[in-house]
């Protein structure tokens, strides 16, 4: 009854209006699961391959019909007949079927769509919530959200190099209250921007993309919004960055070239100067987390940054680790970063995603479950965050339904868990000396 009888993929659109995959899995019992695949704008060079058609006459070359065909004509044939509850066996079968180290043959987008749909179908078959199916009886931790309320870098047209300015409502007693803190700060920020005559249009992840005078102007405006909403910076709410440094790192000159986004006259920093600058910001403002503060291939820089700031700030590897246990294992061994960003489409299966989270926790690294800038209404990452007790989630600002869908799912989960639910807040940063 739990045997897979049909697998079907179709091309749909993501939050940027670009094609992506939606996959459906059916079982003998009638149980059903659907998975949709996100897509990134700033991507690590070591990420699993997102298969695109390359036909410029259709969606500007971004079509996903090849990946759709791979699901319908290759993967489906391989996994029909499997028990839908055997997630690892199905994921391993798809990895073997692809046969490449980066899923470049079938496409990580094709494989991931199936992986998510299989998990959802299994949960449907067992008549349990997805988070409960994936995590078991010990599932209880609601994640502290990193809310990206200012978008810069590759996520907007704002002249700021750093890609994300985030607020983290660590002082809230519950996830529901944390979400309220964030929403109130978001609206307070909008009022401040309007009063300054700055733009209130939003970027890919729902945050504002105003033309600030620079990074510090952005941070100080966020602090003003936190205070205007009635909260205390550095107590109720902290600040975080996603620098996405690989987006403005000049490999030939080996410098961090802020002029790429901030224009003529902006800073050009060596690796050592980049670390000095980040430390200066940490000492000046209530910053608790920095993602991709160094380029993905600047291992010496990462190690130096971790040695300098790793005990008081969460240093998250995104492009640096690409949700890959090989890169994470090296980082752990060499003392680079102290946290990993978890993006399911960077690696391509739920099995490998869970392995990365487990490896991080065993090493004392935190794991931050994350969306992508090109999202869908699929809320699987909310369930993954709770299922793994990851403790942190990054899923955008307090606008755009593609972001709010994840927050609303977390509200439902918190309700369902009832008294068992725990919101860790500041305790989610267990690797810091607070």
UniProtKB/Swiss-Prot annotation:
Cofactors, names only: Mg(2+)
Pathway info: Carbohydrate degradation; glycolysis; pyruvate from D-glyceraldehyde 3-phosphate: step 4/5
Cofactor note: Binds a second Mg(2+) ion via substrate during catalysis.
Binding of (2R)-2-phosphoglycerate, residues: 163, 343, 372-373, 394
Pfam families: Enolase_C (PF00113), Enolase_N (PF03952)
The keyword Magnesium is assigned to this record: yes
Keyword Lyase part of the UniProt annotation: yes
EC number: 4.2.1.11
Subcellular location: Cytoplasm; Secreted; Cell surface
Main location: cytoplasm
One Gene Ontology CC term in the entry: phosphopyruvate hydratase complex
Keywords: Cytoplasm, Glycolysis, Lyase, Magnesium, Metal-binding, Secreted
Residue numbers annotated as active site: 205 (proton donor), 343 (proton acceptor)
Enzyme class: lyase
InterPro entries: Enolase, Enolase-like_C_sf, Enolase-like_N, Enolase_C, Enolase_CS, Enolase_N
Reactions the enzyme catalyzes: (2R)-2-phosphoglycerate = phosphoenolpyruvate + H2O
GO BP of this protein: glycolytic process
GO molecular function: magnesium ion binding; phosphopyruvate hydratase activity
Entry binding sites for Mg(2+): 242, 291, 318
NCBIfam families (alphabetical): eno
Family label: Belongs to the enolase family.
Function: Catalyzes the reversible conversion of 2-phosphoglycerate (2-PG) into phosphoenolpyruvate (PEP). It is essential for the degradation of carbohydrates via glycolysis.
Protein known as: Enolase
């Amino acid at each position: 009854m739990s045997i897979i009888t049909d697998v079907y993929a179709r091309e749909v659109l993501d939050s940027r209006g670009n094609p992506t995959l939606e996959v459906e899995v059916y079982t003998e019992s009638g149980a059903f699961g659907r998975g949709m695949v996100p897509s990134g704008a700033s991507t690590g060079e070591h990420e699993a391959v997102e298969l695109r058609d390359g036909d410029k006459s259709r969606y500007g070359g971004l079509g996903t019909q090849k990946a759709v065909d791979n699901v319908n004509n290759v993967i489906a044939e391989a996994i029909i007949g499997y028990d839908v509850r055997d997630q690892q066996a199905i994921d391993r079968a798809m990895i073997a079927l692809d046969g490449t180290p980066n899923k470049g043959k079938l496409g990580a987008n094709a494989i991931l769509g199936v992986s998510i749909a299989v998990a959802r179908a299994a949960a449907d078959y067992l008549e349990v919530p997805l988070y409960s199916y994936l995590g078991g009886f010990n599932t209880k931790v609601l994640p502290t959200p990193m809310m990206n309320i200012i978008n810069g870098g590759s996520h907007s047209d704002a002249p700021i190099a750093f890609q994300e300015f985030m607020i983290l409502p660590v002082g809230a007693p519950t996830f529901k209250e944390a979400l309220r803190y964030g929403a109130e700060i978001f609206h307070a920020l909008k009022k401040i921007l309007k009063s300054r005559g700055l733009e209130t249009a939003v970027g890919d992840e729902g945050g504002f993309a105003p033309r600030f005078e620079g990074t510090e102007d952005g941070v100080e405006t966020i602090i003003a919004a936190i205070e205007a909403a009635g909260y205390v910076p550095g107590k109720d709410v902290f600040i975080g960055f996603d620098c996405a440094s690989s987006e403005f790192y000049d490999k030939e000159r080996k410098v961090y070239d802020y002029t790429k986004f901030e224009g003529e006259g902006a800073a050009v920093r060596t690796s050592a100067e980049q670390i000095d600058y980040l430390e200066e910001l940490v000492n000046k403002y209530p910053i608790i987390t920095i993602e991709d503060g160094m380029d993905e291939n600047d291992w010496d820089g990462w190690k130096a940054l971790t040695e300098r700031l790793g005990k008081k700030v969460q240093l998250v590897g995104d492009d640096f680790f690409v949700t890959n246990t090989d890169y994470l294992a090296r980082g752990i061994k060499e003392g680079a970063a102290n946290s990993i960003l978890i993006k399911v489409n960077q690696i391509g299966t739920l099995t490998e995603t869970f392995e990365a989270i487990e490896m991080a926790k065993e090493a004392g690294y935190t794991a931050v479950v994350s969306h992508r800038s090109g999202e869908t209404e699929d809320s699987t990452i909310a369930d993954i965050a709770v299922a793994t007790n990851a403790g942190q989630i990054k899923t955008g600002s307090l606008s755009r339904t593609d972001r709010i869908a994840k927050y609303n799912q977390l509200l439902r989960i918190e309700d369902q868990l009832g008294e068992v639910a725990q919101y860790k807040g500041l305790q989610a940063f267990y690797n810091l000396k607070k």
